[in-house]
């Protein structure tokens, strides 16, 4: 499941609702998954990873994985699978995660 991209009902940070958007599965937890948000707004924060192979991943436009927007979600919130990250993008996500999650 790691690196698969889904359309998902992703909640707003203020819990006022949700928006259907692409997400990347980071961890499979059985009925749940840890996911991060994907945005088409190109940004370059310390927790952002540019998805270089965005067409291969099933995305409609250049996109960024936002590793600072992570939640645990029920898989029932997944609407459809869009694709999977290319191996180079998977490695970039792992590297950025490891660089920023050192305790």
Q: Which role does the model predict for each range below?
A:
Residues 56-103:
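C-terminal terminal-subdomain/extension
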Residues 14-19, 25-55:
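Compact nucleic-acid interaction/catalytic patches
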